[in-house]
Design a protein with these regions (language model features):
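Hydrophobic alpha-helical membrane segments
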Residues: 1-263
Length: 263
């Protein structure tokens, strides 16, 4: 079977945003709880940049998988979600580690300011926080600003030329392709939909800044949203499915239970 990425129909970004928000609403409880937990861990480990990057990437990639699960299942359960994430954990962690290491090398070689020690990628007290502000809103901003900043950088990590593509991870996990094949296929889909992908990139840059400053408590929602947005874009480009699958009716769910089948 040969997969050929499609060019999305006009109005793709608006369609993807609406579909992503619908998936987010359907799976909000468990999904948001896991995202919030990851954001809090990013805050706890904010002195360790590599760890924070790994956590942020894992949270975003995990959200892509959860979005696929929400789309396919009438109801999302914590046990099922954790099982699914555990199955894909090796690929998720390897891909996150690859991006983190590549990003660290790029920072050391090209982006580090003069006089900044290279080992700051492992541990830094710069911009570290010891005491939270007594003001509740400011304290929330202090907590979630690190995960907001990390989320904004994730887009660039997912688009390292010759190494990663924004659709590569779902190609590996949801289509079962090996790394190189997923990279080539993901890059082809990205090129065919360059304007829409660049618009997604603009959202990756702008929304974390706005939410980090104005709505910090909703930063975990952004991880879920961008995971869902990436998934629905992937789904339309590579699978030709532009709309979310409808939820099963309550009657169908009841009919599928063991009790109803024994009656």
């Amino acid at each position: 079977m040969t997969l050929e990425p499609r060019q999305a129909a006009p109005g793709a970004l608006r369609r993807w945003i609406l579909a992503a928000l619908q998936l987010l609403w359907r799976g909000a409880g468990v999904w948001l709880a896991l995202s919030l937990l990851m954001c809090l861990w990013i805050f706890v480990g904010h002195r360790l940049p590599l760890l924070s990057a790994m956590l942020a990437l894992s949270a975003l990639l995990g959200s892509i998988l959860i979005a696929a699960q929400v789309d396919r299942s009438p109801r999302i359960r914590l046990a099922d979600t954790l099982t699914m994430l555990r199955v894909h954990a090796p690929v998720t962690l390897r891909f996150s580690a690859l991006i983190t290491i590549a990003g660290a090398i790029i920072w050391v070689v090209l982006l580090a300011k003069p006089g900044v020690a290279w080992w700051n990628i492992f541990y830094t007290s710069r911009n570290a926080l010891d005491i939270l502000s007594p003001d509740g809103f400011v304290a929330l901003r202090q907590i979630f600003v690190y995960s907001a900043f990390a989320l904004g950088l994730c887009y660039f990590g997912l688009n390292i030329p010759g190494l990663t593509s924004i659709f590569q991870f779902p190609c590996m996990t949801l289509l079962g392709l090996p790394y190189r094949d997923a990279l080539r296929l993901g890059a082809a889909g990205q090129i065919r939909n360059l304007n829409s992908v660049l618009a997604i990139g603009a959202l990756f840059v702008v929304l974390p800044v706005l939410f980090g400053l104005l709505l910090p408590v909703l930063v975990p929602v952004l991880y879920c949203f961008f995971g869902a947005l990436t998934y629905v874009a992937f789904r339309e480009i590579f699978l030709g499915v532009s709309e979310n699958r409808p939820r099963e009716s309550a009657e169908a769910r009841v009919a599928a239970t063991p009790l109803s089948s024994c009656a």
